[in-house]
Amino acid sequence: MENGKHPLVGVLAIQGDYAAHARALIDSGAEPVMIRTAEELVGLDGLIIPGGESTTMLRFLERDGFLGELKKFVETKPAFGTCAGCILLAKEVLHPAQPSLSVLDAAVERNAYGRQIDSTILSAETSLPGGPLEMVFIRAPRMTKVGDDVEVLADREGFPVLVRQGHLMAATFHPELSADRRVHQLFVDIVKRNLNGRRSSQPVEEAVYTELDVRTQ
């Protein structure tokens, strides 16, 4: 938190609508930083890995040791992956298989909901305060399995679409394309609590959701 006020949250600016993520972070009380090299990870308090094409993103990250440094970062600091970012965080990637950062205890099936023309916007219930959550799906992956310590915050047709595991969050949809800032706000709250030394092994959820509840009233 070099600016002394807002946490510094990186946005991996390789593919996807990273500018929309940056706007959502500003609205949620964080300072966004566009990241394209491993060196730029230094000093960040958290990181968002946006959507895009996961194999293309992976090839970019494999240059100059970026992938290794990114893995070290997400193992210890808050990270939020959306769509392709969710694939990169997952421990198991299916149809077809591919390497990943392997930190989120989940199995993810790529492009499970069909082609981009079949993408959709829907509203679904969530455990976050404030009522149903708008979800924008674009060539979305599907989480087919999550570990016991992964909290499902929202689902679609019985499959998780928004999850949290300690300092990690993942979504198979694009919250940055919605005016609803609750998802980004939750991540920023996790980043802030991590900075304050309240580790993810503690019961963070209740306090974070209470803060969200106050803001949605």
Q: Where are the regions a protein language model picked out?
A:
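Solvent-exposed alpha-helices and their adjacent loops that cap or buttress functional pockets
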Residues: 2-5, 39-42, 72, 80, ...
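A generic structural signal for alpha->beta connector loops
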Residues: 6, 29, 76, 98-100, ...
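Cofactor-binding loop segments of dinucleotide-utilizing enzymes, especially the Rossmann-like FAD-
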Residues: 14, 84, 173
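Hydrophobic anchor at the start of a short beta-strand
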Residues: 32-33, 79, 168
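Redox-cofactor binding/interface segments in oxidoreductases and associated redox assembly factors
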Residues: 49, 81, 171
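Cysteine-nucleophile active-site neighborhood
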Residues: 54-125
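Amide-donor transfer/coupling interface in amidating biosynthetic enzymes
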Residues: 110-217
